[in-house]
Every structure is written in C-alpha cells, then in structure tokens.
Amino acid sequence: MPDIILMQDNAAEKNISAYPKAFLPLDGKIDLSQFASYKVDFGKVNGKCYTLPFDNGATATFLRTDTLAEAGLTPADFNDITWDRFIELGRIVKAKTGKPLVSMPQDSADFIAIMMQSAGTWYFDANGKTNIVNNKALHECMRIYSQMIAEGICLAATDWNAYIATIQTGAVAGTINGCWIIGSITAVPEQSGKWAAVNTPRIASMPESVNYSSNGGSSWMVLASSKNADVAVDFLNKTFAGSTELYDTILPKSGAIGTWLPAGSSPVYSKPQDFFAGQKVFEDIVGYAAKIPRVKYGIYNYEARDAISIALYDILAGKDITEALKSAQETVMFQIGE
C-alpha cells in the first residue's frame, strides 16, 4: 500500500465518511491556512481535515482575442460581468462572427456546477439534505444555461473529445472551465498570442454570487495504515506545503497550477505567458482561487450530478425546469434513502 494517495476533491468527503479510519487527519501537522480555503473544506469531515490541496480547479473564461476583435470586443468586456451580460455579448459574437461564444459536452452538468459554486450553494444543504427542487440558484442556473443553448451562444458538443475539438479548431470563441483546460488550449501552438483569460460570470439575481468558481481538482491524503506516516507528512510539508521551487518546476512542465497561496508570488507564476499575449495568467488564476466560495459537495455528490445531468437534458428537450428538478430530487432521495 502507498503512504500517500491523490484523490479527486468531489469524491473526498464520500470516501472519508465511508472509511473513517483509512485516512490520517492532518490538523496540526500541516499549515492548511496557506491554501485556498475552498479547497481545504473539501477534505473536512466532522471537524477534521484529511486532505492537502493540490491542483487548482479555479475557473476562468478563456477567450480567442482574434475572434473577439472581429466582433468589436476585447477580453476586458468579459471581466467582472454577470451571466446576463455574458449572453448579451454572446449575441454580438454570434451575429458578427457566426460562432458560438463557448461550448460544453451535452452530457455534462459542469456549467451548472460552476454557476452553483459561484453562489456558494450546492445540491445539498448544510445538513446534507437534498436541496434541488427548491434551490433558487439551481433554477436560475438551468434558466441561464438553457437560454444559452437555445440562442446558440453555447454549443452542446456530442462528447468530451468533440468539446475539446471546438476549442482547438476555433469553432467557438472560447470556453469556461477549470484552469486545467489550459493544457488543451496550449496544445495548438499556432494559436499562441491569440488567447486571454478573465474571471467567471456571476448570477445577477443572487447577491451572494461572485465572479469566481471551481471545477475539478484533487488533493493529497496520507493513509492511516502507513508505517511511515510521519515521514509522509514531513514529505508533504517540505514539498506541496512548503516549496515554491517544486511548484516552479511542475508548472511549466505540466501546467499544474497549485492552490498553495505562497506559490502564486513566485517568479514563475508571475511570468508573462506568450501564449496568452503576455498575460500573467497563472498569477491571475491563483488570485481567483483565493476568492472561490466554499461549498460542501457532500457524500452523494456523484448521484446528484448524474440526476442533474438528466434533468438538464430533459429541460433542453422542452421539459419545465421545476418539473425536471422535482424528478431529479426524487431520484437522488430514492438512491440515498432519504
């Protein structure tokens, strides 16, 4: 058995709750205050912290500057805006260039999740109870997304590969996703200098919604059964929780943007990126991560996301939003025995 494992953030709470003796609490062993707080919360169960945050899932709006220029727009037009304004700008881009503004796999509820976290809410309430049909933010997210699809502002790609292709071929003007999508964006060298990144739209009708969110990411965990647990913790303290040199090394090679906040002030993170026309994009994203609202994904996050994906499909096919969310809530409650 390994001493340290890497786990997806959205699965952490479920696995910790299911196997409470399998993982070593890291409270008092690692200074978790040095990490983006929203990431620390993903691994917190019953008041104890079990995860050391690693790669960043902070979202950004990534845009083709040449396409925007055709529409008479600049990346600055998309910074600190609402989703309603995003739709207005999408109409301009569509009218002037014929291209959708963004895309997303048609079987994915990632857009909904991004919007939800920006408002600091999720599919479960603070007590872990299913919170779908009466969730005002979720209703608004469904309305916004279905409107973007209906108006051709968001292209529903057939699958993940098709989604990536829309970005890399220039079929759309950009994408909104976790910062790990940079790896797919920069895989087309001839597009260097034609990209920019700004923050994520917020929900106008939700005062608590901000221009920052997350999608994806993972964290390190130490197995409680490890015979070298102290050594494992010491290793993490000297690397992912204590070494700007480490982050400086892995960033250029893998594009893995950390959530250890001190790394954001290193020269490598603050280096202007040619692919993004000189923008200090990594530094900007670390700044976004520090402002992401905290949410608790809960034990049954995957069950909820699957139900929401089905509800989204039904809504796009014409079903009433409330009815679709009612069905989703009933499905989740049945699955988890609530």
What feature does the model see in each segment?
Residues 48-54, 59, 69, 84-131, ...:
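Extracytoplasmic/periplasmic solute-binding protein
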Residues 1-7, 21-22, 98-99, 169-178:
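Alpha-to-beta junction loops
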Residues 8-60, 85-87, 114, 196-199, ...:
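Hinge/lid segment of periplasmic solute-binding proteins
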Residues 81-87, 155-169:
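Short helix-initiation/N-cap motifs at beta->coil->alpha
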Residues 87-92, 128-157, 200:
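Glycine-centered hinge/linker elements that transmit conformational signals in sensory
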Residues 1-13, 31, 75, 204-207, ...:
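Conserved N-terminal structural module of periplasmic/extracytoplasmic solute-binding proteins
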Residues 6-11, 160, 177-182, 218:
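Beta->alpha turn/N-cap motifs
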Residues 15, 181-192, 204-307:
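C-terminal lobe and pocket-closing loops
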